[in-house]
């Protein structure tokens, strides 16, 4: 029985670009899946990937927040016929192979339902690239609820949790592929009624599955509201990842979240943002909170760009130190 956590192990922080990016590549994040409220020793911790459970020790270098593909058409129009799975496979596989060639072993795929999540495609890519890919359950309410299915508005938090737990126990979309975490999205705080409901549903799913909650949070106020809801639900903050925390300008909120035990994720790392990310990470280190930090790129392939066969933002080349848009050699 175990509670899922990201474990971040890192050497002393370096401040120039090359060293910082090397540090990022060396960061190992372990997403431990299971159920209950007790952590297993690291030797027995396991992670749910699209190909099944693996020991956490096999994660290796991990990108904790990336996307293979996104479709921004909205929940009402989202359907598989909008893209050809084999074309996406051929376009994305070289980037995953490049990540593997430079030492990467695991990619946490954060695309939720109704925005382009395709778990069978992910399993095919995982098998071909020999990478561990981790998918999710949950709903994304950010962007003004555009990506929420109709039933999310009328159902209770418990009813939403029932759907997400069905993914965990029985598999996603009539497959045997199970989620390794919960992904939700909320707009800037204060939380709306429906976004509060999403957080409660995630908390109740976590209570019964142990899956960690990764929350796209519109700002720091939203993240603080989410943490308050988790407190009301009796959830340990170590089960919560504040996604896109770098967008919050009040850096004291980063400290407040981390001091409560939450994970603070600085993503969108690329050549244009690395200096600012260095500053954020240094501050967390100065406050002895580096162990609560996650770093990723939030790379993605946008479905609308598929015909051009060039990702809008690729899964980045870790060695290059920037968000590459060129194809791998």
Where do the language-model regions lie?
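N-terminal export leaders
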Residues: 16-32
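Alpha-helical scaffold segments that flank or form the walls of functional sites
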Residues: 60-64, 74-132, 157-177
């Amino acid at each position: 029985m175990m509670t899922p956590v990201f474990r971040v192990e890192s050497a002393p922080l370096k401040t120039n670009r090359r060293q910082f990016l090397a540090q990022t590549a060396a960061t190992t994040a372990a997403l431990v899946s299971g159920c209950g409220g007790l952590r297993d020793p690291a030797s027995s911790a396991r992670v749910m990937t699209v190909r099944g459970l693996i020991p956490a020790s096999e994660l290796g270098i991990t990108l904790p927040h990336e996307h293979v593909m996104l479709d921004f058409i909205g929940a009402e129009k989202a359907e598989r016929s909008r893209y050809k799975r084999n074309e996406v496979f051929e376009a994305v596989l070289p980037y995953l192979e490049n990540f593997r060639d430079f030492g990467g072993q695991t990619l946490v795929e954060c695309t939720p339902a109704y925005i382009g999540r395709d778990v069978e495609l992910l399993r095919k890519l995982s098998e071909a690239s020999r990478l561990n890919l981790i998918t999710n359950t949950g709903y994304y309410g950010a962007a003004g609820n555009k990506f929420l299915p109709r039933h999310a508005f009328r159902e209770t938090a418990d009813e939403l949790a029932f759907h997400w737990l069905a993914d965990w126990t029985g598999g996603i979309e009539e497959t045997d592929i199970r989620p390794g975490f919960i992904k939700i999205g909320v707009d800037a705080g204060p939380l709306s009624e429906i976004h509060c409901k999403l957080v409660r549903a995630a908390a109740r799913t976590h209570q019964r599955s142990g899956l960690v909650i990764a929350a796209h949070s519109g700002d720091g106020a939203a993240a603080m509201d989410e943490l308050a809801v988790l407190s009301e639900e009796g959830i340990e903050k170590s089960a919560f990842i504040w996604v896109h925390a770098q967008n919050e300008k009040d850096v004291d909120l980063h400290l407040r979240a981390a001091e409560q035990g939450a994970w603070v994720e600085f993503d969108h790392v690329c050549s244009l943002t690395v200096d600012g990310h260095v500053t954020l990470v240094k501050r967390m280190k100065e406050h002895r909170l580096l162990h609560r930090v996650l770093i990723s790129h939030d790379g993605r392939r946008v479905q609308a760009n598929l015909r051009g066969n060039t990702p809008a933002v690729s899964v980045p080349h870790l060695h290059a130190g920037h968000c590459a848009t060129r194809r791998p050699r």
